[in-house]
Regions:
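Conserved catalytic motifs of the protein kinase core domain
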Residues: 30, 50-51
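Acidic/histidine-enriched, beta-strand-rich ligand/metal-binding domains
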Residues: 28-31, 38, 69
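The feature represents the first ordered module of a protein
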Residues: 24, 37, 42-43
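Polybasic, low-complexity binding patches
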Residues: 41-50, 60-92
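Histidine-centered catalytic micro-motifs
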Residues: 33-39, 55-61
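Short cysteine-rich loop/turn motifs with clustered Cys
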Residues: 4-33, 57
Length: 92
């Protein structure tokens, strides 16, 4: 398997899992996009395994979305690393 195929297989698993925030709210079958955790590096994407499945509302569209207000999102749902730990447990 190539790195590219491993990466796409991982992304497929994330999308199939659905939005991690919607799951926490009791809505298990939501559509998900890939959110790359940037680990504080401006303009740099994280390793493909450092990604979260988020629906458009929790990723970039809503007033509680990560990209609208990272601080508000983190206060309500936890850090990206905490969410990543939860996602990784669910993928096992």
């Amino acid at each position: 398997m190539t790195i590219k195929s491993i990466k796409h297989k991982h992304y497929d698993k994330l999308v199939t899992l659905g939005c991690i925030i919607c799951k926490k709210m009791g809505f298990p079958n939501s559509h998900a996009e890939i959110h790359h955790i940037n680990e504080g590096r401006i303009g740099k994407r994280a390793n493909f395994r450092m990604c979260l499945p988020l629906c458009p509302s929790h990723h970039r569209n809503g007033i509680e979305s990560y990209h609208y207000s990272p601080k508000k999102f983190t206060k309500k749902w936890g850090t990206q690393k905490q969410l990543l730990t939860l996602v990784n447990k669910m993928l096992r």
